[in-house]
Amino acid sequence: MKFSELAPRERHNFVYFLLFFFFYHFIMSAYFPFFPVWLADVNHLTKTETGIVFSSISLFAIIFQPVFGLMSDKLGLRKHLLWTITVLLILFAPFFIFVFSPLLQMNIIAGSLVGGIYLGIVFSTAPGVGS
C-alpha cells in the first residue's frame, strides 16, 4: 500500500510514528557511543564503576521490557506509552546533568540504580512499545 492511498487519519498516525522512531534512534545513536566517555571523563568513574552502571542499565532493561510489553498489550492503543517515552526523551539532558551525574558522584550504587531505571525504561522499552 502506498502512502498516498492511506486515509488522512492513517497518514497522520504514520507521520507521528515515523517522527517518533526517527528522533528515538537519533538520540540513541548520539548518546550510546559517548556514554562510556562521559562516565569516565566527566564523572571520573573507574572502569569497574562504569561496568556497574552498564550492568544496572541492562538489568532494568530486562525487567522493564516484559512489563511495558504487558502494558502495551493491555492498552491496545500505544499512544499513551509513546508519549510517556517521548517526555522522558525530552528530559534526557536535564536528567543527566541535574540528577544522574550528581548521584554518580555521591553514591555509585544509587546513581546506577536511578540511571538504570531511567535508561532501562527509555532506551530498552521504546522499540517494543512502538512496534
From Swiss-Prot:
It is found in: Cell inner membrane. It comes from the Bacteria. One of its GO terms (cellular component) is plasma membrane. It is a multi-pass membrane protein. One of its GO terms (molecular function) is lactose binding. Gene3D superfamilies: MFS general substrate transporter like domains (1.20.1250.20). The keyword Plastid does not apply. The chain crosses the membrane at residues 14-34, 51-71, 81-101, 103-123. Belongs to the major facilitator superfamily. Oligosaccharide:H(+) symporter (OHS) (TC 2.A.1.5) family. Responsible for transport of beta-galactosides into the cell, with the concomitant import of a proton (symport system). PANTHER family: 3-PHENYLPROPIONIC ACID TRANSPORTER-RELATED (PTHR23522:SF10), BLL5896 PROTEIN (PTHR23522). This is Lactose permease.
